[in-house]
Amino acid sequence: MPAYRSRTTTHGRNMAGARGLWRATGMKDSDFGKPIIAVVNSFTQFVPGHVHLKDLGQLVAREIEKAGGVAKEFNTIAVDDGIAMGHDGMLYSLPSRELIADSVEYMVNAHCADAMVCISNCDKITPGMLMASLRLNIPTVFVSGGPMEAGKVVLAGKTQALDLVDAMVAAADDKISDEDVKVIERSACPTCGSCSGMFTANSMNCLTEALGLSLPGNGSTLATHADRKRLFVEAGHLIVDLAQRYYEQDDETALPRSIASKGAFENAMTLDIAMGGSTNTVLHILAAAHEGEVDFTMEDIDRLSRRVPVLCKVAPAKSDVHMEDVHRAGGIMAILGQLDNAGLINRDLPTVHTSSLGEALDHWDISRTSSQNVRDFFLAAPGGVPTQVAFSQDRRWDELDLDREKGVIRSAETPFSKDGGLAVLKGNLALDGCIVKTAGVDESILKFTGPARVFESQDASVKAILSNEIKAGDVVVIRYEGPRGGPGMQEMLYPTSYLKSKGLGKACALVTDGRFSGGTSGLSIGHASPEAAEGGTIGLVQEGDTIEIDIPNRTIRLAVSDAELDSRRAAMEAKGALAWKPEEKRKRKVTTALRAYAAFATSADKGAVRHVPE
């Protein structure tokens, strides 16, 4: 029987000093035999997805105490990728994932916590906490802050839904007036919560449901809706039950590594492919699997992508559909239900809230449930009132979206497309693979050949796009933006958004060893591995080289002979210390913190995790 970890600091004569300090935090004699649960919050006023979390940690804490545990809250950092976008702030985004994982490990291990509730929401926070949970392998429940309501705006007499990406695209479109840009800007992000499309934050929060580490509705229930409060209340009770099952009954099925097994990772990636999730999820799923010592690789993702259809299209792939619409159609449980009907997921795996995923689907999938409470839960609608307050409205739709032929969520028999929403491409340009979000690619450019326009920074590419130097048919290549080369693997949302602004969203391709925002659409191919800074072929591409992209056949090729590539590689290596670096010095400040990340970062095909030699 495993001993409660916390007893290292709460039991024994020699721990009198530690108990004295615990007492100073409010603990009493009766508390020293209870499980100590870490409430891992990420409140910050910098990020709309986290601005409402301040009081939610204490909400969970009070429920933990009611259930017989001792709750101790701490905070970790949260970077807003949208605010950090387009300048050197983006260098810090991906490295913050490792910092978050480390900070959770530091706090939980230093204080010998027994279990934890992770209150996350945005892009790197959920992945960082997920990595920490699998690294620590103590009972854990995830509950996120929830999605933002979609913006609504009236332009030219027509009401349309919009989000952050629409504001970025409009700002760079010369055909849109300054006044209309202001209207869009003021309407795009109306409430607290993670940005309203199937961007990285919402993708990851949805995947926690498929992994079995969060409650149903975690990925789709709006941050503003009163129904979301139930998830926080239940998380507080559930974590105490999980802790007691593990420490008092020796039940290892309560542990993250037992729940998030290889089969669960396959379920999560199957969901991701079916809903056209952000390409960033590939990085984060690979990183989480690494922390959990799960043998899940790019080859597994490639295998799954060839058999899973697209069952749901959400912004940016479908601009008028947002997370509130996914929720009305039954949320993640409904998508998993359709995948289950098609035999595409493993329904026998445990979750934190049920003995099997199949049991959860039978109760929570609105297409099969007999529970009126479940059906009412998925009627939760946006309030339509700008606010930064959680649980502040209780509006409901008149009816559910149960249409599995033409609705927001489709069946495997009537999918948006038979090919999945993500694909792994390989070829001489990316020997270890690269990723494209096929759900966001127009059918007319699934096969694409064009001349390379080579840039050695995101900034240089943006300047060229806005100066009308990029033409239809070009392949924009942005290199030295990988985990080491950036460092930090910047998101390329501005280049892709500006291509759309210039009317080139369906006429150009973009290939990079950097990554893309979940808000990116178009023929945007990222994570080229090995990256340029590690000797990848992308570092050898020259202006005007022909690049051939074939998504149906999963290939990407630089149309240059092996002999020529060998010659270019030899010439590069001859540069010595200057090899595999940008030819011109870039105007970016790389601090000690960023250099430390770059020194140990692996390429994207390994999840951009750190590799520290023994």
From Swiss-Prot:
Residues annotated for Mg(2+) binding in this entry: 81, 123-124, 491
PROSITE patterns, A to Z: ILVD_EDD_1, ILVD_EDD_2
Enzyme class: lyase
Bound cofactor: record note: Binds 1 [2Fe-2S] cluster per subunit. This cluster acts as a Lewis acid cofactor.
Sites bearing N6-carboxylysine, chain numbering: 124
Active-site positions on this chain: 517 (proton acceptor)
Keywords, comma-separated and alphabetical: 2Fe-2S, Amino-acid biosynthesis, Branched-chain amino acid biosynthesis, Iron, Iron-sulfur, Lyase, Magnesium, Metal-binding
UniProt pathway: Amino-acid biosynthesis; L-isoleucine biosynthesis; L-isoleucine from 2-oxobutanoate: step 3/4; Amino-acid biosynthesis; L-valine biosynthesis; L-valine from pyruvate: step 3/4
Presence of the UniProt keyword Lyase in the record: yes
Cited InterPro entries: Dihydro-acid_dehy_C, DihydroxyA_deHydtase, DiOHA_6PGluconate_deHydtase_CS, ILV_EDD_C, ILV_EDD_N, IlvD/EDD_N
GO MF annotations in UniProt: 2 iron, 2 sulfur cluster binding; dihydroxy-acid dehydratase activity; magnesium ion binding
Biological process per Gene Ontology, one example term: isoleucine biosynthetic process
Membrane-spanning segments: none
Assembly: Homodimer.
Record NCBIfam families: ilvD, PRK12448.1
Protein name, as recorded: Dihydroxy-acid dehydratase 1
Gene designation: ilvD1
